């Protein structure tokens, strides 16, 4: 029995949901998102509450039950509040700046890195050492933040690089003479 799947998903004010077949569409103030569930679960909407129930007792149905409920909850959070990932840059001469829709990163490489985010995600640089990634799709926001971080991961000796805000970087001691 899935403890996560048993919980119903409440729809906040201003958010509506409609089910057609195995697809649920959630509309909110920040946009519209849809999710197609597998045939192992049933989606129902009653009184601003979305419930997910398994269609059988197979292991796959129980796995999809909790996963589908979490996906629906993420859709509701995305269209009502949105998702946000914050990155910080540490290192001498490491900078970020926005030029139009393109993020320009100066990371000590022989060239500047230009990154254009995909549709549905907004990237801003409030300071030269901060990057904010926002959007309604949690997976896409996380992937864009990971792609930006990939250009210069934090190194363990001085801690230079791009890291998530609040991320702990394991530090190593240098060679001893």
Swiss-Prot record:
GO MF term set: rRNA binding; structural constituent of ribosome
One CC-aspect GO term: cytosolic large ribosomal subunit
Keyword RNA-binding: yes
InterPro entries: Ribosomal_uL6-like, Ribosomal_uL6-like_a/b-dom_sf, Ribosomal_uL6_a/b-dom, Ribosomal_uL6_bac-type, Ribosomal_uL6_CS
Range of residues in the leader sequence: none
GO BP term, pick one: cytoplasmic translation
Domain of life: Bacteria
PROSITE patterns (UniProt xref): RIBOSOMAL_L6_1 (PS00525)
Transmembrane residue ranges: none
Gene3D superfamilies: Ribosomal protein L6, alpha-beta domain (3.90.930.12)
SUPFAM superfamilies per record: Ribosomal protein L6
Record key words, sorted: Ribonucleoprotein, Ribosomal protein, RNA-binding, rRNA-binding
Subunit structure: Part of the 50S ribosomal subunit.
Family label: Belongs to the universal ribosomal protein uL6 family.
Function in brief: This protein binds to the 23S rRNA, and is important in its secondary structure. It is located near the subunit interface in the base of the L7/L12 stalk, and near the tRNA binding site of the peptidyltransferase center.
Protein name (record): Large ribosomal subunit protein uL6
Organism: Roseobacter denitrificans (strain ATCC 33942 / OCh 114) (Erythrobacter sp. (strain OCh 114))
